[in-house]
Amino acid sequence: MFEKVNRSGLIIYLYYNRDAKKLQDYGDITYHSKKHRYLQLYVPTQEVEQLVGRLSKEKFIKKVRVCHIQELETPFVGNLYR
């Protein structure tokens, strides 16, 4: 049966858009901005620290940031319409 795997997002800034194909082996690419040359990569939470260190050393990557979407509170209270 299907088991839920906790995943964390990484925002990876690239020098060239053509290097995005090289990152498919590391995790799931959910978004790629060709204009701003970054992509969002989802990886298992246990591997985040190792991957940030490994990806930061790659020559085709400008910067790696960890996405903090899991730290936001999602139960919204109140009316969304004004």
From Swiss-Prot:
Keyword Cytoplasm: yes
Location within or outside the cell: Cytoplasm
Keyword tags: Cytoplasm
Organism expressing this protein natively: Streptococcus pneumoniae serotype 2 (strain D39 / NCTC 7466)
Pfam families in UniProt: DUF2129 (PF09902)
Family statement drawn from the similarity comment of this UniProt entry: Belongs to the UPF0298 family.
Broad class of the protein's primary localization: cytoplasm
Gene Ontology annotations for the cellular component aspect, listed alphabetically: cytoplasm
InterPro entries referenced in this protein's UniProt entry, alphabetically: DUF2129
Source organism phylogeny: Bacteria, Bacillati, Bacillota, Bacilli, Lactobacillales
Protein name: UPF0298 protein SPD_0651
Keyword set includes Transcription: no
